[in-house]
Amino acid sequence: MTLTKMEVDSTKGEGFRPYYITKIEELQLIVAEKSQNLRRLQAQRNELNAKVRMLREELQLLQEQGSYVGEVVKPMDKKKVLVKVHPEGKFVVDLDKNVDINDVTANCRVALRNESYTLHKILPNKVDPLVSLMMVEKVPDSTYEMVGGLDKQIKEIKEVIELPVKHPELFDALGIAQPKGVLLYGPPGTGKTLLARAVAHHTECTFIRVSGSELVQKFIGEGSRMVRELFVMAREHAPSIIFMDEIDSIGSSRIESGSGGDSEVQRTMLELLNQLDGFEATKNIKVIMATNRIDILDPALLRPGRIDRKIEFPPPNEEARLDILKIHSRKMNLTRGINLRKIAELMPGASGAEVKGVCTEAGMYALRERRVHVTQEDFEMAVAKVMQKDSEKNMSIKKLWK
């Protein structure tokens, strides 16, 4: 049997077909690899171009001449501003075309060109990082329902702090000035700081918390500067509440003393008095101070106009102790039949913090015996333990608040 010429050619073609298919697949892999390399190189090129642009901008900034920093005294007209530059003096300068005259306000920091003294940039206010850290970013989750036995104090602080912030028009209608500040005083553990947290939660204001000891600084003038910057920050974030805990550390009565440390503390208090007189109550800045030694505070700090209301926090009575017990035992796993009133009767003279400590100690007794519930006996043993600590306290402090 003989094959024709056409059949022979088709047989040869069928033999080369797998070879060409393999070759095409190899070339496709090479093309895909080259394309991937090209995309990678393009990404690297874009990244390098971005770095080049950034370095060019940085080089341009480095080549720019330095600017004078001044403070605006007042705008003169649409194109002129009176600026104070230390130590040269005051100058009337022109505005750069990029600066809006409406953004230029008195006491703001500005940058002036080195040669022409043209105002070309508005700078942010200078605030110490230690002062900026005093601002509480997260609003405390304490509420008035978590404060037991202080109904009268809650009503008074609402009138002084919460009402002016939320409804200032009521004071305008009556024609009376808004209160500036309030002093919370009483023995330790009676709920002063807890109530301040609740006020911050309900007013939805910027809450700035500072301890009096933080304002006592090593170098002369540092404490006064921190007080000034504290109120500057409060104005910028108004409405705001400044809570000063342990105010007796800087607000004690002034005495004749040759000590440099005492003089610096007195200067800090004088700056605080100046700020309390200087800022207007209508700016929605309220001051809450707390202390457990009102007897040593300076009379100048306590006068009306600076501290408009003084709220006493006495030790809780039996009903108040019962309310505090109910609040702190609300989430505890208690056995049935626990008589909380009897437990409150066993703690005469106890503070709110000690009542909370009784609940914690009762839970610890239950844990010690591997139980998941708290009994009446646990509470009674906790009362005995906590009140025993109370009886060993310094008698002079107890005598002070008798």
From Swiss-Prot:
InterPro entries: 26S_Proteasome_ATPase (IPR050221), AAA+_ATPase (IPR003593), AAA_lid_3 (IPR041569), ATPase_AAA_core (IPR003959), ATPase_AAA_CS (IPR003960), NA-bd_OB-fold (IPR012340), P-loop_NTPase (IPR027417), Prot_ATP_ID_OB_2nd (IPR032501). Its main location: cytoplasm. Transmembrane segments: none annotated. One of its GO terms (cellular component) is nucleus. One of its GO terms (molecular function) is ATP binding. Keywords: ATP-binding, Cytoplasm, Nucleotide-binding, Nucleus, Proteasome. It is found in: Cytoplasm; Nucleus. Belongs to the AAA ATPase family. The 26S proteasome is involved in the ATP-dependent degradation of ubiquitinated proteins. The regulatory (or ATPase) complex confers ATP dependency and substrate specificity to the 26S complex. This is 26S proteasome regulatory subunit 8.
